Every structure is written in structure tokens, then in C-alpha cells.
Amino acid sequence: MKQTGPYISKNGADKSGFKNLAATHWNYRPAALYEEAIRRGEGHVAANGPFVVKTGVHTGRSAKDKFIVRDASTEKTVWWDNNKSMTPEAFDLLHADMLKHAEGKELFIQDLFGGADQTHRLATRIYTEYAWHSLFIQNLLIEPKPEELGSFDPQFTIIDLPSFEADPEKYGVRTGTVIACNFAKRIVLIAGTSYAGEIKKSVFSMLNYELPPKRVMPMHCSANVGEEGDTAIFFGLSGTGKTTLSAVATRTLIGDDEHGWSENGVFNFEGGCYAKMIKLSAEAEPEIYAVTRRFGTVLENVVMDENTRELDLDSAALAENSRGAYPLSFIPNASATGRAPHPKNIIMLTADAFSVLPPVARLTPSQAMYHFLSGYTAKVAGTEKGVTEPEATFSTCFGAPFMSRHPTEYGNLLRDLIAQHKVSCWLVNTGWTGGVYGTGNRMPIKATRALLAAALDGSLNNVEFRTDPNFGFEVPVDVPGVDNKILNPRETWADKAAYDAQAQKLVKMFIENFAKFEAHVDPDVRAAAPAAARAAE
């Protein structure tokens, strides 16, 4: 078998069960991966240098096709209400058939780390069928030092073969697409999808499973740190402003998506970013826009003019979920270490399209756990579907699809860390004010930034607060530089009775969603439920 590449590991592909491969390409650098991807017709080079690819029918994660092997080690540790199970026998059969499918093929191999904290990092080997997938994951994870690569010994293996179509009847899966996680063997198999985000999230799923027993909190969040070492964590679902609000010139960006919180502080799981590209502009997000004009960036499903090779970031012709994968080093004020001290502030972002929640609220540790387990935001349906009513979304831990263990395991760990390090917790609504979506207006970004700045510099703790009658958390009454009217959402509605009705509707949604956690949390967390609902009971 032919082996090429700058750093070929002594622990070869045969250790992972591969036989009769045509060639293995080890730890290729971006320029070489560009050449290989172009030679194979995998994509095109756009103007200014990024590599543009189409992922075909899969333009997002296939959440319904993800499985975890159910065995003696996972029977009582995995949250089976939220995760589909696969038998060990089905996994072994799928694994063997994928290894057989790889025979005669050329594979690209990257040896990388998941986690910037050396105590808790995961040495990960990724086998990919596509050269661009190899570039993608090199951009996203953390590259070892050259001296670490020759003897790299993987703790975790990902095998990514988009051309392998799974037989649902044979393997007990749903479609030809499958993401199969075997935590005991530390292997993930990805088949039947070209969407590269599955590779990145497989590492996150493994860390989400392995870290909590070590008292390390895995988090679906962005993070930044100020000059005084004051770290801030931003939890939030898609569309809440997690990436935008954490990327500010006055603070160093630790990362935009996945982090751990250990005894040593906060650390990025990754060495890159995977940002949405749709409608990206140089005016609104100059730092992210700049990476679309750089060699090394991978752009998924971004429309490109075939003649000029210029990008059309406004077009959703290929996908609404167009993405860019690039190294964190492409962002000017990004951390070189991916590490920061213990957080001083935790921000939980929500885009409340019901216009009930205030723009900012201060949370107790128990309230923080309640809202962390709730993971609330509201999606606004597309006009093409003719739906104008907002849709409430509750994604526990602000990342339910990636949570291998029961949410309360993460919630209890987070609450303990908040108490231990005396962290201030805030709920920030980046959604609507003055009425529901369609009637009210989007929360002014200027106001959100001013409130965040006050929270992070500590001055927000010194203003007068009132207790919200619906949710029981504390809301500032007067903040310098912010229109006081928007601080009280009820006052922004012309029809106060309509606000009260809408508030009770949202309160009821929270209560109904949290019912599944009631038996698993302490009385103080149950008591953090919306106040109006408790009074009505």
C-alpha cells in the first residue's frame, strides 16, 4: 500500500482494520488537499482562494440517522429518551462492511486533537474518502505539533465514507445514511452523507459522553475573555446571536461553538470555526466575511458564479444552511491557546419571538440550571410556508442533539461549577420587543451590546432591579445608555392585556416542557419555574 504525506504515523491504517487500500494520504497540508480535491472533481477554487463544495442532498445534519451502540457500558449512562440505539452486532457488521467497501480506495487521514486542555484532550484519527473532508476537519480541530505526529496514537477513530450506502434492513437503521457511535470502542462510522458537519459533531458527541464523569463540563457555547482575564460563556441555539455577540474587538475570542470547563478553566474543543454564510456582509460581520476571501477556507453550498468565480453569499439556491469552515487563526482577535480562566459571567441567549422576555435578566444558580435545562428559543417559520406564528423550541442544554447523557447530569455539573466559582448568570433576549413577530420589532443590537457590556464589566450588578412577575428573575430598571422602556417588555406593548395573555402562554410552554425533568432535579430548581404558573397552581 502506498503511503504519502508529511507525517506518516507508525500506528498505521492497519491498526484500524483497513486492508488492501490503494493509498493512504497522511496529514496533508491545505495546498496538497486543494490539489487532490480538484484532481478528484470534489469542488472549485473561488475568487480570492476559498474552496467551494456542494454536499448534495444532505445540506445539514441527519439527526434522525444518528445511533449510539447500546451495550453494558452505555445501558445506564446514555440518555435513551433522546438517542437512538444500535446493537453491538449491527455496529460490528456495519463496521466490517465499511472496511470492505474501502478496499481499493485512497483514503485521507488526519491526526488531530479534540480539546485545547492537554489533560482532557482526545487524540482523534479521521479517515475520509474525500480530500475536502480532510481539509475541513483539519480546519476545525486542533493540530498536533510536528513532533507529536510521528508517534500519534489515536484514542478515538472516525471513519467517513460518503459513498457507502447503508442497507436499512441489514443494519437496523432508517435510511442509507447512518452516523453510528460506539463509545466503548471509541469509533464513529459515518456513511451515506457528504455533509462535513457530521464529522465535527461526532467529536463533540464523544467528548459530551466522556468528560462529565471527570467533572469536566462539555458545553455547546461560544466564549471570549477580556483583558482582565474575565471569561464569558455564551449559550444559545442557532439564530440567537452566539457567534455575533461573542466576536467583539475588545475581547479575545476563545471559540464559537464547543468548549469544556475543567478544573483548569475554560478550553475550546476546536481549533476552528464553522459559521453560517447566508447573507453574510462585510458591514455586519467583517471578520467572518473576510474568511470567505482567503485560501484554506472551505465553503459548503455557497453559490458561486461559474465564470467569474465570485461568491453570492445572499443566495440560498443550494441551501439556507450554507457554511464556512476555517481555522480560528483566521480571526484577528482569536486566542492562540484556546484556553481561558474560569468564567466570570454566563450568558444564556434566546431569540424570543413572542416578545415576552426582557432584553436582560439576572439569574440565580437554580434559575440558571432551570433555563439551561429548558434551552428555550423561538423559531420564526419561513413565509413560503404561510406560517406567521412563532414556534417555541426547547433544546435542553442548548444542544439536545449532542447530549449523550441525561440533561440533569450536565445541569448539576454546571450548577456546581457556577456556585464554586461564583459566576454571574444572565438571560439575554435577542428576539422581539413591542409585540410578537410580525407586529413588534427585533431587539436593537445596539441595546443588546450595551447591556452585555454592562453585564461583563460588572456595572449591571450595581443598578436597581425589579422581580419579573412571570418568571421570577431580576430585571434591571434603569441602565445608562439604554432606553428604559425596552427593559420592561410589558411596557413596549400597546395592548397590555395581550401581553399578559402572551406571557401566560409562554409560561405554560415552559412548565409543560420542564415536566420531564421535575423528578430529576432538586426542589430549588423546581422552585425556579415561572412564578405566574406557580401562583396559578
From Swiss-Prot:
The keyword Nucleotide-binding applies. Pathway: Carbohydrate biosynthesis; gluconeogenesis. Disulfide bonds: none annotated. This is Phosphoenolpyruvate carboxykinase (ATP). Belongs to the phosphoenolpyruvate carboxykinase (ATP) family. Pfam families: PEPCK_ATP. NCBIfam families: pckA, PRK09344.1-2, PRK09344.1-3, PRK09344.1-4. Keywords: ATP-binding, Cytoplasm, Decarboxylase, Gluconeogenesis, Lyase, Manganese, Metal-binding, Nucleotide-binding.
